[in-house]
């Protein structure tokens, strides 16, 4: 359902003069009316012509096109965001296909690596270990009192790039930009946070420009006590906030999620968001290929928290299609750098133990090796689906893909590793190796593939199809927790919007131009499930939809009225 056009009420503000022009959430630049210029002491501080936001956006678009590199475009857009947020979101929404890869993956990876070099202006909150005893004061310094969504990182596992220290702040900033651009959550309600617990990246420690705490990362009890102090301070300041954990290292991601998911409304996008969008993609791809997800045999390359999170959500989904959990687990095969996870493998992580295969059941496999490689697994399992979350480039070789296609006429191949430089195989190669028969979805954006004069659109399995809708649904419903069932309802809703399923052709995921519509539908499904699960107050469907409409922010200037401080 499209948002209803609503008349914006006037906004009463106490700021005036240059202070108002320096306030990104309120600045209109050349769009201040003559009356506003008189009332807010802006006469003579702006050029004579009063422009519309579309005229401003057109000028910004022309300027944007003048930049030749993606990182320069990223810096330019961040500068607009830090001076006029409403214009920033109007511009991004006007050119979402072009700009999403620039404000987020893959370009944000380079921005994180060069954070201290390209730093212009502070955005968000930096909480260093040195300031751990000032946590409450730091959060009180945040000027926006009604924060509803926080994205927090400690910068240790940024995309596939590893430890970026406080450079990881680029991820919460980019993620929250998508909460607004795709999910309609007002930027005034969002807060990016980086927990500066040091860095083990020697290059950063040796960099004279590095702006973070120059110290090796704290670990173990010190680390968990610091994170706990942060969580308690957030609960004290904003008890109803949605907290998203982002790009924490594997050793910390799952423990933190498990520790806090029932204490504060929180989720981990790398684990749960990635799982939700992947499951939604797989449901749609399975229907397009013929059949249900529960019928498919699935091989994962990468058995970290993200891969195992996806696998567990697939297993949780299959009972909806009539398959038992035990039977579902027998269809999922996890491969890491040591080979297939089996019950005879030592040193498994806790979240891996439920995803092993019994070695005794593999005695008839065609292999001469004790270590069961990805090729061994593909040859013997004959999977329908191959998912890459390894963070290592080139591991889906021609031999592996051709072996898969030999037994599966319509293989589903998903190299999900980010950024583009880490992808397990390129869509071009996968399409060629399967004679144009593979359904391909990637983690990073790729151009359509042309093979034998036919165009193959490549879907980006982008978490932005999921987390903005979840955030909007949580805010609109007032949900106090995010349950697995809420995530599964988001996946199912996403699958319902697949052009390939609806029309028999096109992308397996919706086009970006439809992302706000999809986010609103996901918000409704998530809010409804939250009510059914008892983590939100029950209302009518009409009331929930109205709450979504009321909370859906759009990049339009409001009329300003002067008030005293």
Swiss-Prot record:
Binding note for cofactor = Divalent metal cations. Prefers magnesium or manganese.
Keywords per UniProt: Metal-binding, NAD, Oxidoreductase
Keyword match NAD: yes
Q: Which GO terms describe its cellular component?
A: cytosol
Q: Which reaction does it catalyse?
A: (S)-malate + NAD(+) = pyruvate + CO2 + NADH; oxaloacetate + H(+) = pyruvate + CO2
Q: Which residues form the active site?
A: 104, 175
- Give the EC number: 1.1.1.38
A biological-process GO annotation? malate metabolic process
Could you name the domain of life of the organism this protein comes from?
Bacteria
Signal peptide range: none
- Cofactor or coenzyme needed: Mg(2+); Mn(2+)
Q: Which residues bind NAD(+)?
A: 157, 270, 418
The record, for Pfam families, names:
malic, Malic_M
- Which HAMAP family does this chain map to? NAD_malic_enz
Q: State the family named in the UniProt similarity comment for this chain.
A: Belongs to the malic enzymes family.
Tell me the subunit arrangement: Homotetramer.
Name this polypeptide is given: NAD-dependent malic enzyme
- Organism the protein comes from: Shigella sonnei (strain Ss046)
